[in-house]
UniProtKB/Swiss-Prot annotation:
This is Imizoquin biosynthesis cluster protein A. Induction: Expression is down-regulated by ralstonins, lipopeptides produced by the plant pathogenic bacteria Ralstonia solanacearum. Expression is positively regulated by the imizoquins cluster-specific transcription regulator imqK. Pathway: Secondary metabolite biosynthesis. Part of the gene cluster that mediates the biosynthesis of imizoquins A to D, tripeptide-derived alkaloids that serve a protective role against oxidative stress that are essential for normal germination. ImqB is a canonical three-module NRPS that assembles the tripeptide backbone of the imizoquins via condensation of Trp, Tyr, and Leu-derived precursors. N-methylation by imqF and phenol oxidation by imqC, followed by cyclization via the FAD-dependent oxidase imqH carry out the three-step transformation of L-tyrosine into tetrahydroisoquinoline. It comes from the Eukaryota.
Amino acid sequence: MVDSVFPAPSLVDETFLAPSSSETNDTAMAADGTLAKMNMFQFNSMLKEYSPPRFEDLFQDLDASKAGWEHYRPRLVSEVDLIDAEHYSLFSANTVSPL
């Protein structure tokens, strides 16, 4: 006959039980506050260093890589499909300059 329907507790379950003392909670809150300040500082410094790429920067290595474009003339880019194999990114543009 079965004594219990529930399984016996294992050592793994007991390992993850944390003490619930006020000292432990205060330490955890202080650590969370410090981590939040560090993350905010890192985020602000990264934001100051970030500048979005210019359109010209997207095509700066096009001649060196010869990575598959169809037409290029000054002030005219038509049916450009550039696959950068080094970074595994895809850039597509269909722009025509005004006449």
